[in-house]
Amino acid sequence: MKSYDIVIIGGGPAGLAAAVSAKKNGIESILILERDRELGGILNQCIHNGFGLHTFKEELTGPEYAGRFIKQAEELNIEYKLNTMVMDISEQKIVTAMNREEGLFEIRAKAVILAMGCRERSRGALSIPGYRPAGIFSAGTAQRLVNIEGYMPGREVVILGSGDIGLIMARRMTLEGAKVKVVAELMPYSGGLKRNIVQCLDDYGIPLKLSHTVVDIKGKERMEGITLAQVDGKGKPIPGTEEEYSCDTLLLSVGLIPENEISRGMGVDMNPVTSGPKVNESLETNIEGVFACGNVLHVHDLVDFVSEEAAIAGKNAAAYVKQGENRPSGGHEIVLNPIEGVRYTVPGTIDPARMDEELTVRFRVGGVYKNCYVSAYFGDERVIHRKRPVVAPGEMEELKFKKADLLKYPDLETITVKIEEA
């Protein structure tokens, strides 16, 4: 059985950044396992620009951004296996994988970094009534068909869901000559970035209907149209608000689900809100030596933040391997408590003794709040009180905590993060 210091599951933006970071932090024996035929993950089909503004201080396309990390990984002689599917990871960190060349094989790892990314929610999860004709795609599938395979899914398009992929595909389909008739969103707010609404919908005159959903799909062999209806505050269609749209294609951009089947199988504790692992300040799960980063941990808006997070996971995995049995025992653990508008925080716990000099805590809110404050309470004392003109679920928020500040509170058990009205 081959052994590696660090095995990384997934060769997308998170896996690549984690590998590069671990290598730069002194680990020589690293292996990336990727199930696709090339490294880069989802970025390979994201041919639009807007990537890299934070990481490289310039605007890149998805393949260009991935290419920079692939080049770094190859220059650092980081080993990787393509077309390789990981089947199982034991608590002892023995990775079982398979590919055509080697068949079923096992690898022993001192540390494992989970970077499997996420998948799209399908039509089945939505329970939309109607037939099952040809012409219904997830937005990511349509993106791959257009950008990589060179196929046009349809000519008259309706998009359900206003996640970033759906917004970007509204623009992409328009540029390819299709007529995008409407983007419908179940919630009273968009699920995507504000800049994507402006650049992908407003600039192309594509209407966005909030608090609307598809209540019927027409057509047997091929889609012929859909029925759209307004929904009430509980998401139930309002009778009498139905509108008919003729279309041959329905794209679904209705959320992303972190790919955590392997994580659950090995006993990683999961956060029910994010559907990703619970992690501490080192991005380490409840299983010692198993770290998580990127969209498998929680869904990100920008790949730059994925790379930043993955670099932290890679650095901490490297420290774990180098310290081995001499790893210092931690101090007391502080629990982050998201309430009143804050849905979750990553990380969920902080050990000040083990954290870096500064820690970024990322979170999402549960609704749109205008002229509000993002506040953090150390016990009963309000320490952070930051004014925000608007916060929305489609845009990730962050707070920064300094180690020196946390060490001033040796008995602190809970940090409460919440939204307060101005």
Indicate residue ranges for each PLM-predicted region.
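Predominantly flavin-linked oxidoreductase catalytic cores and closely associated redox partners
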Residues: 104-105, 111-208, 213-222, 289, ...
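Beta1-alpha1 glycine-rich phosphate/pyrophosphate-binding loop at the start
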Residues: 4-68, 72, 144, 153-199
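Short, aromatic- and glycine-rich surface loops/edge beta-strands on solvent-exposed regions
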Residues: 374, 404-422
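Exposed aromatic-hydrophobic patches
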Residues: 362, 395-406
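FAD-binding core/adjacent interface of flavoenzyme oxidoreductases
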Residues: 1-9, 67-156, 232-240, 251, ...
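A Rossmann-like FAD-binding core segment of flavoenzymes
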Residues: 68-90, 95-97, 174-261, 357-390
